[in-house]
Each structure stands twice: as structure tokens, then as C-alpha cells.
Amino acid sequence: MRSPVRAHPRGFFLLGARLKEDTDDLVDLELVAALLNLPQLEFSEDTLIEARKRPWLEPLPAPFPALASRFIPGSPGSPDIRLIIADPNPGASGRPVYIHMHGGGYVTTSTVIYPIIQRIAYDCQCLVVSVDYRLAPETSYPGALDDNYAALQWVHDNAEMLGVDRKRIAVGGESAGGGHAAALALRARDRKEIPVIFQLLIYPMLDDRTGSTRRAPRCMGRYVWNEASNRFGWSAHLGVRAGSAEVLPGSVPARVENLSGLPPAWIGTGSIDLFAEEDITYAKRLMAAGVPTELAVFQGGYHGFDVIAPSATVSRRFTEGWQSALRRAFATV
């Protein structure tokens, strides 16, 4: 029997009403329960204000590192940028550093940013600098990329003060943050000012054409992040219609023709994530360009499954996979 349609207290449609439909048998069994109480919020101009009101999760207690905020100058003509820093060993020197960009579809801030960066710092024993970049649609491309590059430049220039090794700088993020990280790696390659040793792309948002000029397979994008949300997020970020000919060159990682010379990459996604196909394609293109690349596709995982159901076996395997990749990258320099 199908689950009855239920309304979330905030008025969102619950994904639990979709269980037992045509593609639900593809969801990992341990991930199904988490969908029952998950609000389905389709991103649009009408829902964006409500989405930005969602409360953030509180920081984790000790032994996870405390968090500190710091403001740095933005690019010329741009406002200062807030950085959120997680330091597992204050006062230490010569450490690797991970520059993190949060998810949120380019239009909002991830509500789980605090525990995410605390866990990375603690589990990977690196300084984590998360960039509170400007959001779309208020700021369109290249505003957020300028913020992220300014943060990369600041970390590199202040390595001694931060106690980090400027030869061990990695970039990464989840979802839209993964898209930002890919774009940042491309800019760093093109400008040849700052060496980046690794890009950690966790179910990255890489291609504006998904859901606009290119339809995803029916089994992908049924949960959490769908084609309509993707069109809205990309259009807001780009300042033009997603998938159109007006998209600026270099603004979409998947549209960049030359991927050679980029740092090694780890790309991970769930098999039924809307981004699965574009992530697999990007990984294959990196490999073809001679970029050392590890691709991990986890059966039955929808978008953000590791955050929504962190105790599931597949989620633990996913997290262990990218954490191990980041530690290996830091150890090889």
C-alpha cells in the first residue's frame, strides 16, 4: 500500500508519500526510512526565503575542534568574506589545509556546515577553512568564484600565520560546493599563481544542462534535488537561463573543454542522485585528460544521502572513502 500524502508542519510535501512508486526499489534499504520525514522543498523564487530560514545545526562538542570566524578582504570592489575555520591543533605548524565550499544549490547556505567541517578537521587532521561565499541570485557568476579564489589566495599568502604548508592545499565541497571547488581548481590552473594538490568533489553540481537541455535518466533526481531545483539554482548562479547559449565561457565546469593540468580528483556520488550522470562524465573526461581521478558511485544513494542518513552502512562507506582519499592526497606531498 502506498503511503498517504502527508504535509510537513512548514507546508512542504513529504517525500514519504512517494515511497513504493516506480523507482523506489532502487533506494538503498537503509536510506528509505530517512525519506519518510524529509521535507521536499523544490527550490524556486517563491521558496527561497523559506529555505534560507532553516536553522543551522549546532557545532559539535569536544573532542571536535572549536570554530572561529575571520573576515578577509574580497576581490577589488567586493565586500569582505567570512571564513569559518576549524583547527584541530591550534599552534601547530606545517599542516595540510582544506579549503571547503558548502552546498546549497548556489542559492543558500548548507545548514550542516558546522559539523561537516569539524569532522573533516578532526578525522583528517588538517586545518579546514570554509568560505562563506556570496549567494545567488543576489550575486551571479563570477562573484562567488571571486570570493573562493580570494580565500585561496589569502590562505596561501598567510600560510605561516595559519601554521599550514602552502604546498599541501586541497579544495573541495559538497553539491554546489563541489561545483565551486571544481571551478576554483580550474581558475587556479589557469592563473598559475597557487598550487592546488587535490580536489575533493562530493556529489558535485557541475553541469547547468542537466534538467534543462539534457534530461537525466528517470531513476535519477527523484529525491532531495530535482530537475526544477537544478534549473533554478543554475539560472540564479549564472545570471542567465540554465542550458542557454548565453552562459559565459568558463562558468560551468562541465562545459570547459580543456581539463588537462588539473589537480588529482576524487568524485563520489549516489547512483540515483540527479548529478550521477554528469559526475561520471566529468570523471571520465578528467581521466581522458590525464588527471589522476578516483570515481566512486554508491548504489542506492540519493542526493546528500550521507548527511540525511549518516549511520547507514552505505553512508559510512561513502564518508570513509572520501576521507581516506583526502588523507592520501595530503600524505603524498
Feature locations, PLM:
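Hydrolase active-site cap/lid region
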Residues: 186-244
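Catalytic active-site module of serine/aspartate enzymes centered on a nucleophile-bearing elbow/loop
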Residues: 312-333
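Short beta-strand element of the alpha/beta-hydrolase
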Residues: 94-103
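Gly/Ser-rich "nucleophile elbow"/oxyanion-hole loop immediately N-terminal to the catalytic nucleophile
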Residues: 156-171, 191
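Short amphipathic alpha-helix adjacent to the substrate-entry channel of hydrolases
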Residues: 111-130
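A glycine/proline-hinged amphipathic helix-loop "lid/cap" segment
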Residues: 1-85, 243, 330-333
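Alpha/beta-hydrolase active-site loop
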Residues: 139-160, 322
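Short beta-strand/loop motif that positions the catalytic acidic residue
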Residues: 267-269
